Regions:
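Internal gly/pro-rich beta-alpha loop/helix module
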Residues: 19-26, 38-42, 198-275
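Short cysteine-rich clusters marking metal-coordination/redox-active sites
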Residues: 32-35, 54
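Active-site histidine-anchored catalytic micro-motif
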Residues: 371-437
């Protein structure tokens, strides 16, 4: 029952258990007589449907044109947002777990504008498609070729982003996922998105509205103040988002569909442990692409994706998630687990909580995760092809071959150590590692990127 109350979209509106309207962000919207009648009637399909509302008693839309300093409320807000999208503008749209930055997915100039303003020159952008046809994928299939498993995932209640192959005739803006054969596709997951895509009549780029690496923005005032130089306009609603949940991302790997990121609609993710813990544990995660995990008895709950732990806001959201998981599940952690890297924000946070702490080496954690997912006993040889992580010898490790089992790993092969110019920047700029390896081997190497001081 707890899982039913917390998981999926309810995670972003529930304040406390039990899952009743007064304990959600819908408490600010008193039911009108008609909705109240449906809510209290045991024979009605909306009986105790906690978010039930109608245009007269539910959340309202507002549109703010930041470039023209105009505000429109009510039904006209949607029309105003559509007009700006058709004009090639970037519009920030409030969803269930946060805001998206949206623009016309077939307009190269609009996508270029979004990339320039968000300082995101190359990373692929997700595309939201209108629901159409018997299975909802008629428009998707004009641009992509989802297989059966991908189609089922696209239309599932979670509505994740699914990486799927482009069609040869795909005429989306070529700078959405330049040089790639795949596109990150997803369908509308809220009534507002459905109305927006239906009104627009075509696909829209929908990327997280955030400062790069931070958690997705959720507050109306925050998104206007922090992304006023990115979005031309803002489509708000007035239902508070209790906690952020970014879009989940899935892809087919070999014969199975794998989550690359869990989030809105499929988190907190509950997993069964093959053993029983003597006391509750909270795992703080690493520094990049952070999540929080809470484990007790024979289960573990993994939070939605939080982001990089480089900013005060990231730490604030991290602390909220750690606190809320314990409150929502009625479990208080007695031990904290953290990455052994002393420079990580999560490492320092765990050390300041006044609880027993266990350090875990970065690549051993990845190896143990692989074993846990496979659920096969015995000895393993695991190749951890990961970015930078602190190793047991005090150096920064990269691709490692680890033999053994969880709790008893030994490194049996690795790259020869080399100096890493820029430190952990090399994790995001792999050419630095390539240049360093060339220097170490004393072999000729190509030119460094222009305007970079590394060559000097």
């Amino acid at each position: 029952q707890r899982q039913m109350c917390i998981r999926d979209r309810r995670y972003t509106l529930i304040e406390a258990l039990p899952y009743d309207r007064p304990n959600t962000s819908m408490a600010d919207f008193p039911l009108c007589p008609e909705c109240k009648s449906e809510y209290v009637s045991a024979d009605d399909r909306r009986f105790h449907a906690e978010p039930v509302a109608c245009p007269s008693c539910g959340p309202q839309l507002s549109f703010v044109d930041g470039r023209r300093d105009t505000t429109v409320a009510g039904d006209s807000a949607l029309s105003a947002a559509l007009a700006r999208l058709r004009s090639g503008a970037v519009v920030a749209v409030k969803g269930i777990g946060g805001y998206h930055l949206m623009c016309d997915a077939c307009d190269v100039a609009a996508v270029t504008l979004l990339r320039q303003r968000k300082f995101r020159p190359d990373k692929p952008l997700a595309v939201m498609f209108p629901l159409a046809g018997d299975d909802g994928l008629e428009v998707v299939r004009q641009y992509a070729e989802p297989d059966t498993a991908e189609a089922e995932l696209l239309t599932s209640p979670a509505r994740p982003i699914v990486l799927t192959s482009k069609t040869p005739r795909c005429d989306l803006a070529d700078n959405i996922a330049a040089g790639l054969s795949e596109i990150g596709a997803f369908l509308p997951y809220s009534p507002l998105h459905q109305l927006l895509l239906e009104g627009f009549g075509g696909p829209l780029v929908a990327t997280s509205a955030n400062i790069s690496g931070e958690p997705v923005l959720t507050n109306n005032d925050d998104v206007e103040s922090r992304l006023g130089n990115v979005a031309d306009a803002f489509l708000h609603h007035d239902r508070p988002i209790v906690r952020p949940a970014d879009d989940p991302v899935f892809r087919r790997i070999a014969s199975s569909t794998r989550p690359l990121r869990i989030g809105r609609g499929c988190a907190p993710l509950e997993l069964e442990l093959p053993w029983t813990l003597p006391a509750p544990v909270l795992a703080a995660g690493g520094h990049m692409k952070g999540t929080v995990a809470l484990a007790w008895d024979d289960r573990v709950v993994v939070s939605p994706h939080i982001g990089e732990m480089d900013s005060p806001r990231s730490l604030k959201v991290f602390e909220q998630v750690a606190r809320d998981l314990q409150a929502l599940y009625g479990v208080t952690a007695q031990t904290l687990v953290r990455d052994a890297h002393t420079g990580y924000t999560t490492h320092r946070w765990a050390g300041a909580q006044g609880l027993p702490v266990e350090d875990v080496w970065h690549h051993q954690a990845h190896a143990s995760a692989v074993v846990a997912e496979a659920d096969l006993p015995g000895q393993w040889l695991v190749f951890a092809w990961d970015g930078v992580g602190l190793g047991e010898d005090g150096t920064l490790w990269g691709g490692e071959a680890l033999a053994g089992a969880p709790g008893a790993w030994r490194r049996v092969a690795s790259f020869r150590p080399f100096r890493l110019p820029g430190g952990e920047r090399a994790g995001r700029e792999p050419w630095r590692s390539a240049a360093a390896l060339h220097w170490t081997s004393e072999r000729p190497w190509g030119d460094c990127p222009d305007n970079d001081g590394l060559a000097e």
